[in-house]
Amino acid sequence: MNFENQYGVLDRLLHRLAFSTTQAQLGLADLEKTLFRKELRRVEELRPVLITGLPRSGTTALLEAFAGTQVFAAHTYRDMPFVLCPMLWGTMAKPVRRRDKPRERAHADGIQISLDSPEAFEEVLWKAFFPQRYRGSTIPVWEDVAHRDFEKAFRDHTRRIVALRRRAGRHPRRYVSKNNLNLARIPALWDALPDARVLVPFRDPVQHAASLRHQHARFKEMHAKDPFARRYMEAIGHYDFGANLRPIDFDGWVDATPDLPGPEHLAYWIRYWIAAYRHVLRHEPERKRLGLIRFETLGERPDLTPIAHHVKCEPNDLNNRRRHFRAARPHEVDLSHVPSAWLDEARELYEQLSARCLLTRDGT
C-alpha cells in the first residue's frame, strides 16, 4: 500500500479525526449494541484464534488463510478508520463504498491487498483500554490484563466483527486476528480470554533478522517522507519498524544486552529474536492453547490438519487455503558483525522450537 497514492486529503482528514476520538468511539461502540442488537444476538461467543509473533514470520499469510474460510471473521481495511465502532462505520460508509483493485502492500513483499483484505487492527482496542502501556521507548511485557471492562469489550468487539463480515454474504462463526503485540501478553492474555487459541509462527533466525532489518530501513525512509504514514501505523498500534519502532522488552533484554547495536544492524534483530522466542518457549507448556508453526514448513504448503485440530476447526477449511503460503526468497546475509555466541544461541533455540512445531506432529 502506497500511502501517498492511496490516501487523499479527505481520507487523511477523516483518519486524523478517528485517531483523536478514541473515547468517543468507545461510546459509539456502546450505541452499536443497541442499534444492532438483533444482528449481534445471532452471533455466538466461540473461542477466538489469535495469531502472533515477530513480524515477517508468516502471520499475514496465516491470517489470510483463516479469514478466507467460511468459518472465521477478521478485521479488514474497510473497518478503518473507526475501528472501535465498525458496524456503525460500515453502515455509514456503505453508500459510498469504494471498489478497488488488489495492489502490493507497503512492505513490497509480493503480498497483494485490497480494501477487503484482512488486516491487524485489534491493537486499537488494547490501546484504548491500556494507554499507559505505550508511553515508553519499549513495550513492556504484560504481567496481567486486568481491567474492569476490557474482557467484555473484547468479547463484544469480536462479535461485531463476525456480524459485520456476515453482511457480505458469508457465514463466519469465530473471530481471528493477527496482532504481533499479543506476543507481549503471553501468558497473561489467557486471564481475560481463557478459551483463546494462540498460534505463534517462527522463522530461521538469520533470515528472519535480515527481513526485519530490511523492513525497518524501508519504513524508516517512508516515515521520513510521509508523516501521515507514521501516524497511521502508530494509531493502529504497529510499532514494528521505522520511526515507530518500540520493541517488546522481554526480560529487560534491551538494557541487559551490553553494547547492543542499533536496529540498522543485523545483530540487533538477532538479539530481539532470541528474547522474543525464548519468552514463547518458556510458556510452550501451554500446549493446549499455544501452537508453534515453523515458517519454512508453511512455505512447503503442507497438510494443515494439525493446525486445524489445535484450533478446533474442520481441516478441509484450512487445507483449501494453502495457496496463501509460499517459500520466501532467501536474503544474502553478512554475519561478520554478529557475535558467534548469539548465532549459536539463536540456532539452538530455533531447533528447540522446531521440535515442538505443530506441523511436525501426527495431528492427534
Regions found by a protein language model. Give the residues of each.
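PAPS-dependent sulfotransferases, especially Golgi type II membrane carbohydrate sulfotransferases
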Residues: M1-V43, R213, K220-T364
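Pre-Walker A (Motif I) flank of P-loop NTPase domains
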Residues: E45-P48
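P-loop (Walker A) phosphate-binding loop of NTP-binding proteins
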Residues: L54
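Conserved phosphate-donor/acceptor-positioning beta-strand/loop module used by diverse small-molecule
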Residues: K178-N180, L189-H214
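PAPS-dependent sulfation machinery
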Residues: R78-Y175, L245-F250
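Hydrophobic anchor at the beta1->P-loop junction of P-loop NTPases
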Residues: I51
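A conserved segment at the C-terminal end of the G1
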Residues: T60-A73
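Short catalytic-loop micro-motif centered on adjacent basic/acidic residues
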Residues: R174-K178, G291-R294
